[in-house]
């Protein structure tokens, strides 16, 4: 387990999908994270970046898909996603820069 000085090195980007957008009402947020990060590092990083209290973190490793190109086959990168549930009473995270 490598410790990183900046929590923004662990949390790479929010996942924008229909499923993750629907979970926002339940204070559940989905992020792309570094593949070598663990749940404890993800929890600490989210709490430091967004100043919220995290209740739980679930992770999923997604295999990169094989895609066909004009010259043959390529492969998308494999990613790791973290599904972060905020504690009850915690304020929502403003991901899109607009009022909730």
Curated annotation (Swiss-Prot):
Organism superkingdom: Bacteria
Q: Which UniProt keywords apply?
A: Ribonucleoprotein, Ribosomal protein, RNA-binding, rRNA-binding
Q: Which PROSITE patterns match?
A: RIBOSOMAL_L23
Keyword Acyltransferase found: no
Which Pfam families does this entry report, sorted A to Z?
Ribosomal_L23 (PF00276)
Q: Which GO molecular function terms does the record list?
A: rRNA binding; structural constituent of ribosome
One GO CC term, this protein = ribonucleoprotein complex
The UniProt record lists the keyword rRNA-binding: yes
A GO BP term here is: translation
- Family affiliation: Belongs to the universal ribosomal protein uL23 family.
Q: What does this protein's UniProt record list under function?
A: One of the early assembly proteins it binds 23S rRNA. One of the proteins that surrounds the polypeptide exit tunnel on the outside of the ribosome. Forms the main docking site for trigger factor binding to the ribosome.
Assembly description: Part of the 50S ribosomal subunit. Contacts protein L29, and trigger factor when it is bound to the ribosome.
Q: Can you name this protein?
A: Large ribosomal subunit protein uL23
Write down the species: Mycobacterium tuberculosis (strain ATCC 25177 / H37Ra)
